[in-house]
UniProtKB/Swiss-Prot annotation:
Co-factor binding details: Binds 2 magnesium or manganese ions per subunit.
Organism expressing this protein natively: Oryza sativa subsp. japonica
Family matches, as CDD domains: PP2Cc
Keyword Ribosomal protein attached: no
Annotated positions binding Mn(2+) 2: D426, D598, D638
Name this polypeptide is given: Protein kinase and PP2C-like domain-containing protein
Pfam families per record: Pkinase, PP2C
PANTHER family: PROTEIN PHOSPHATASE
Amino acid sequence: MGVEVPPEESNRCVRGCCRSAAIPLHLPPSSFSLLSPIAKGSESTVYEARLGGERVAAKKPVLSTSDDLDKFHYQLQLLWWVLPIELDHPGLARLVAAHARPPNYLMFFDFFEPPNLADKIHVEEWNPSVQQVVTIATDLAKALQYLNILGIVHRDIKPANILIDKDFHPHLADFGLAMYQKDIKHVSVENWRSSGKPTGGFHKKNMVGTLIYMAPEILRKDIHTEKSDVYSFAISINELLTGVVPYTDLRAEAQAHTVLEMTYTEQQLTAAIVSQGLRPALALPESGAPPSLLSLIQRCWDSDPQQRPSFKDITEELKIIEKHIAVNSCSLASPANKSQNGNTEVHHYQEALSWLNQGELFAKGNKLDSTVDHWSDIFDQSSKYCPTLSWGSFATCGRRETMEDTHFMLPHMSEEKDLHAFGIFDGHRGSAAAEFSVRAVPGFLKQFNSNTSPTDALTEAFVRTDIAFREELILHQKSKRITQKNWHPGCTAVTALIVRNKLFVANAGDCRAILNRAGEPFPMTRDHVASCPKERERIVKEGTEVKWQIDTWRVGAAALQVTRSIGDDDLKPAVTAQPEVIETILSPDDEFLVMASDGLWDVMSNEDVLSIIKDTVKEPGMCSKRLATEAAARGSKDNITVIVVFLRPVSTAERIY
């Protein structure tokens, strides 16, 4: 790797609890550089990086609490024992270095070109041969058998955590939830009550993983074992065989997410898996899968963990199945197969595109022909009141695996002291529309002058962004940079523009903005959802179907709840990007503005929000974080993004009542 490993006695983490003779645990800043992000979750971001001149993947954890830091050191201890260079296993993503000292805690792994197995199945719509499925299953089972021998339970096996190399060999990654079996049992014993069941605190820390891959005993709040990993393995291999997201009949993951929400609540799905024995639809014999493979999958997801085979048994059975598969099955190295399922040298798919860059480039490339004079020049400058702003934000994935929200804060926009802009974009069916919009909308706003009113500027920015994004999407689909079929990402949007003492808020969808006016909530937005009779009537007049599905009114085959958005080209023109703009004159009665995605408003009322800020130190970033974390604690199932803007001077030492 080109990075020297210090002597073991000095090669240790900042605490001294981690040490290694195989990999460096602290690195000089000049030896590595982080490039572009590859993936982002609630607990970490993975970057493409350079280490000693070589391409690697760098995992940067989110360390918000001392527990997070403890977890980093535990994971590092586990990884360098399991994955040091001298104990390399071909089925595991290899740890090659770490930086275990502040301020940049990092882990470096071998780099694998995207996509992971989940994106390979659901984005590229890869149809592997049965031979390929069995070979991948065998390699994965061997890696999990190796972990089991070492006494380790992975606890989060799913296609998204399986990396595929150029020869289609799998490499298990993301050991963020992995634990030694003895440690899981130790924690459980400490938390058991006289009833013999773990406490609620234990459940919250240990009922981890991804719901559709979690074994029934975990959903019943028992502890993880090797057999829990066996269950997740079976769900994943069946998904590879069928090509559909578990418990749906859809290939596209973003669309399947919507279908799952429409079909089951989380509690209903849990009950069906545990009590009714619900499992994903098993691959059909017509797929070419031998009965022995289908039988193995069914035994692996048996409701009784004791009836499931061990990974040692699974590996032996898969070897036998491999020998009996027809010789003329497509081999992993078949050039014809590579051509049919996607050239291995080209890894373009929708998330590989930088939609952030696309939005910024489009705004810059479509400048308006006008002389620049600013809105602040045309408003009454004799007004004695002008708000004094301080601002902050906080964003979290919440209970979702991926982050589809984006936001921007542009205080003193265009270097004007009385001109400020803030915005939140809540993506659905992927993050592409939200990423494009977060650069395009403020880019357009910067170009408008006093000949266009702020209301018209906001409206035009939304509409132009919508058109530009949909045209860009079509362009990339035609050029094959996007390979997924029937992909129609969109986002809701709320943007606030403060011009001297006037506030303008544009909204399309179900994000919200409220003012604290004289101690009472003053709404600056109205939700645009199909449950609103006026919005529903407008959609129907445009010729698009609105029907009651599961729990609410939804629009079209995509079953969207919102009736206005940027993107969603399959539902245009009914689901319009035309925002509703509300304006008001600010006064000393206006204390702060709160903007948030629906992940907050799903579990909090306007009054709740004001009350929480009242009881929080008056620092906008801290208030934003308090609101988001409280929403997560109340059970919000969505991404949560919050912006708080104080409109008059506040002291962080202000007394809390």
